[in-house]
Amino acid sequence: IAGITQEDSSLLSYLYQNAVSPHLAARIEGNPVDTETVKADFDRVKKEYDYVTVEGSGGIVCPIRWDEEHEILLEDIVKMLHLNTLVIADAGLGTINAVVLTVEYIRNHGMDVKGIILNHYSGGAMQEDNEKMIERLTGVPVIARVRDGDRELEVDLEVLKRVYD
């Protein structure tokens, strides 16, 4: 659907082998994130595609690099690249609090939230209420729900276009 034909490695600035926070993986593997590299790689990919989605790692407050030279959070990368944000959250118990706090953090730090996607969505009273409460408390629409095993994202094309505006 996306029409991407190149290797994943050509779309990534950094890919760590250790399944830990990026700052820790970088320290373990001796390959810290350089923001100029990230910016150059993003600009290169953006020239090739009309729409580019950047997947975050660990949430907006995730440390990307944290050492004597630099203290970089994911929010710094989002701001540097002038990205809009989508919040992806588990649909289950505890998500109202987690999503509301995440949206407030993003807004309070000068970024825009374009939508919310609920992951591991199975429906039912709790998850349906979670969705309604999240929209009510944040004013941000839930634009999609992803069920376990889904291979495609069901989202209205006009809604998706607004994410990239």
Predicted feature residues:
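Switch II (G3) loop of P-loop NTPases
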Residues: 38, 42-70
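Structural motif
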Residues: 53-55, 86-88, 117
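Anionic group-transfer/hydrolysis microenvironments
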Residues: 57-58, 92, 121, 149
